[in-house]
Amino acid sequence: MTDLMTSCALPLTGDAGTVASMRRGACPSLAEPMQTGDGLLVRVRPTDDSLTLPKVIALATAAERFGNGIIEITARGNLQLRGLSAASVPRLAQAIGDAEIAIAEGLAIEVPPLAGIDPDEIADPRPIATELREALDVRQVPLKLAPKLSVVIDSGGRFGLGAVVADIRLQAVSTVAGVAWVLSLGGTSTKASSVGTLAGNAVVPALITILEKLASLGTTMRGRDLDPSEIRALCRCETSSERPAAPRSAAIPGIHALGNADTVLGLGLAFAQVEAAALASYLHQVQALGANAIRLAPGHAFFVLGLCPETAAVAQSLAASHGFRIAEQDPRNAIATCAGSKGCASAWMETKGMAERLVETAPELLDGSLTVHLSGCAKGCARPKPSELTLVGAPSGYGLVVNGAANGLPSAYTDENGMGSALARLGRLVRQNKDAGESAQSCLTRLGAARVSAAFEQG
């Protein structure tokens, strides 16, 4: 979802005809794929709110034909295709263009996954997003902005974007005069710096003003670097007592009734990945049930549209057989993983296999009250923020960080031979010490980091 839109973006090539390498800090794209441990990786951000099933099937077919057949949905709800080569990226771009999938480039402009159809949203944010894209498109000289700069236009609803970090955030609020938009800078909705309130017709001019300010300061500047009081004056924001509603955290996996007999099915990818053939097979099956489109969603998830309550239940059962996360209670929802050693040259852990081992040996940890982060290295790409339990791969084995991020100092260690028993001991620690009605998170907090570390390392 960005300001620049094309049917497909042909990769740039260097003098030797190879795909251009990424500039530091940039997101991988068709024009600038990223080298990984399993070949080149491309991130695809469709401009359409909904992708028809034939388009997704065509994309899956192309991913298998021109890559290694692994498709990912990122934490922010973008598609990634893996295992490409310098020769196959242009052919992938052509296949995407032939499927008439419009790809977004440049500034990320994000709206909630069910924007326009969520009965609980305060306003439809898509017209503002479209107006902003168009305003940026017509500029004779494009703005030079930080590569990962993002604008979130959050209308609330069941699946709002309050937990998504943004450089510039707009949150809809209901006022006596109608809908207004609260402007803030940096962070999630609870940590962002508030600027002020804007009327609907003032939103896009204000956003352009902020983007111009960022561009004038250089391509490394982010929303957090701006002075809220200066932006308040520049954008002529009003101060108001209106505050956005607290962000909702409805789980995406599951069947969701939207009213008027409309039903959507939320599904998650197991450990952020799916095989292209499995995805295409599933979409063919649900197409026969009446499904007509999907919407990508944060949290490595997507929604299936066009179902009724009866067919949604069938589609959910089919999804389970294909390995998707189908319900809020799925233990895999509580695990965050990066690509791991199979997909990243920096990783020292095969994270997907480790995640499966964790589900099998320590299900007591995965009640949904905490997150277990499996990181191939100390960079912590899958989850930069702290987790209750973080397992980090290293040349000598694995480290455990309790209540910290992957770059934190581990408090316990084990090697490959001891990992299975270490995970089992953590599960047993919770099982044997958890009080009735107590969550795994509360239990581990009560026991303390020292005891958790000792169980992992020594038993």
Curated annotation (Swiss-Prot):
[4Fe-4S] cluster binds at C338, C344, C377, C381. Its EC number is 1.14.13.83. It is an enzyme of class 1 (oxidoreductase). It catalyses: precorrin-3A + NADH + O2 + 2 H(+) = precorrin-3B + NAD(+) + H2O. Belongs to the nitrite and sulfite reductase 4Fe-4S domain family. One of its GO terms (biological process) is porphyrin-containing compound biosynthetic process. It comes from the Bacteria. GO terms for molecular function: 4 iron, 4 sulfur cluster binding; heme binding; metal ion binding; precorrin-3B synthase activity. The gene is cobG. The keyword Iron applies. The lineage of its organism: Bacteria, Pseudomonadati, Pseudomonadota, Alphaproteobacteria, Hyphomicrobiales. Keywords: 4Fe-4S, Cobalamin biosynthesis, Heme, Iron, Iron-sulfur, Metal-binding, NAD, Oxidoreductase, Porphyrin biosynthesis. InterPro entries: Cbl_synth_CobG-like, NIR_SIR_4Fe-4S, NiRdtase/SiRdtase_haem-b_fer, Nit/Sulf_reduc_fer-like_dom_sf, NO2/SO3_Rdtase_4Fe4S_sf, NO2/SO3_Rdtase_FeS/sirohaem_BS. This is Precorrin-3B synthase. Pfam families: NIR_SIR_ferr (PF03460). The keyword Oxidoreductase applies. Siroheme binds at C381. Pathway: Cofactor biosynthesis; adenosylcobalamin biosynthesis; cob(II)yrinate a,c-diamide from precorrin-2 (aerobic route): step 2/10.
